[in-house]
Amino acid sequence: MTTRAQSAALTCTAVLLWGCAPVGTRYLVGDSQVGLPAVPFIGLRYGLAALCFAPLLVWGKVWRWPRADLALVALCALFGVTGYNLPNAIGARTVGAGMVGLLNGVEPLLIALMMALRQRRIPGAGTLVAGLVGLAGIALLALGAGPAMGSARGIALILFGAFAWSLYCVIVPPLLYRRGAVLVSAMTMTLGSLPMLAVGAPGIPHLALQMTTLQWEIMLSMVLGTSVLAILCWNIGSAGLGAEQAGWFLYLLPLVSVAGGAIFLHEPLTLMELSGGGLIMLSVFFSQRWRTT
């Protein structure tokens, strides 16, 4: 049995790893001439991640799961793996790593709102205020971003991914309790990787041949760290904490991404972008403050 402290540590580890993902993705698929094609890249990355989980599927005899659980895990895979990662990879070509992290900072608020809808309770005034503040922050980010730091299309893709991930966080807990975090991680990663592998397959052979040693090293570190280890840590941790409490730790994601983008990619940040990110963080604080009062 995982203690609450262990669950918190695992959840924190997952978010720190995910905070590094936009930096690695932006470095590999950025819109420069040497940037790798985004769709084959994400297909290869998650195809390799699925291979890492394949032995667990055999060990867990997942084909014996009831149809209801198989349908739910397929839905979780669609939202949490495909729906989050494919838009993020494409959006990363025109959105800086720090901007990606700031946009993903809206996820805790989305989780809180979705949980309210699922529990059929009306969000309070505090949640509505938090939502308006968050929307204002997103608007500032969009207005403050230059063409190289955040195109409108790229921002929309990142926000769609944030919505898909938040939905995953809300619908997956019952499955985690019934089937265990390890097997659910294996199933969601494998099933969610298949669509990305399928759409990226035509370009993967050429991509694999053109990648340098450094690019392969970054790719494999992302496969093992931000894809395999992170989803395991998140699912185990969130099973112990619950979706809303685990959402607290998503505060860290924008901080890691912004710092990584500035340090490793030399990404500039305007005052308007920082203000927008601050409003998003403030909206998340309001949503959590309302929840605990």
Task: Show which residues each predicted segment covers.
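Membrane-interface helix termini and inter-helical loops of multi-pass transporters
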Residues: V23-G35, I90-R93, A142-A152, G200-M219, ...
